[in-house]
Structures are given as C-alpha cells and as structure tokens.
Amino acid sequence: GLLIAKEGGSIASKPHLASGITVGARMPSQMVAKHTSGVPVEFGNLIPSDGRYTIVIFAGNLSKPEQLSRVKHVSQVLELPEAFSQRLKQHAIDPQDVFQTLVLHTGSRDEVEITDLPSSLFLGSNPLGQVYVDNDQVRIWTLNEAYKGYGVDQERGCLVLVRPDRHVMYVGDLEDVDKLEKLVSSALV
C-alpha cells in the first residue's frame, strides 16, 4: 500500500515481507509464546483497540549477532532527538500513552535474553510483557507457525505498524525504520 504523509511525501509498504498480513486489513492472530515464561498466547490479543498504535518488530532470529544488530539499529533511530517518541516527550506526552512495541522473534529462549534488546525499543515500558517467541521449544504442536502464518522470513523479520483499530498501516524492512518514523511523525506530532 502507498501512504501519503501529511507533509506531502509518500511511503510505500513492502507487502512481500509479510505475505500473510494485508495493509488496510485487521492484524491476524497467531499463537506465540511469552519469552519470559514460554506460556502460549494469541498474538492478536496483545494488540487491543485501546487508542494506541502498535509497532510490531518481527525481529527474526535474535540468536544471530547480525540480526540482533539490525534490531538495535531500530532502537537507535527511535532514540534520535527528532524521533516521534522524543518529540512526544517534549510535549509532555508519555509515548506509552500513544504507542506500544511488541517484539516477536524466532531465536532460542535459552540463547536470547530480554536484556540483549535495547530498552529504548519499549518506549519506557517494562519489556517483560512485550517480547514473544515463535519456535518449537515450548509446545511443538501449537508454536513455530506464527512467522509462517504471517508470511514473514524467520531469519530477517520485518516491521509492522498497526493502527489503534487493529488495522495494519505499514509493512517494511527493519532498515525501513526511518520511513516508519517519518510516517508516524507526520501523522501525529
């Protein structure tokens, strides 16, 4: 889908990165596991219609250092002074009131620690309830299907922006975080 930002620019989604997710449609749900406990949950239930946007970081295989580095780049862009989260803070608005971030990875829960992820990804929230895993380490009969269902590459991942009404607004590469940032900034701040 092509999105027109308020400032006149256009930002094109990359639907091929998540072939099971349709821009403009509701975010589908898949079974995943909570990273901290391994308890299975419906991913769609983590995206409530509560007035907040949700940034879903399909982080891919975080057991690989090069993939963790790609995810850290996302946080570096979100920490820039001109980033939407920083601009919200300048207006005395808590970013958590407007956004939530969810991370879904395919790495091993034994090899990946939540503390490996930059805290800035979580916009000041507690990351313990925001990191989920899709692999077959917990219950093989219910897991390791979310990335397939979403049509996302299990190694590389992608970014998805979900509107407050649970409809998908944007799909891009992790390296496209600057485009996501521009889209959000032009729409909100």
How would you name each of these model-derived features?
Residues 1-189:
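Helical substrate-recognition/capping region of FAD-dependent monooxygenase/halogenase enzymes
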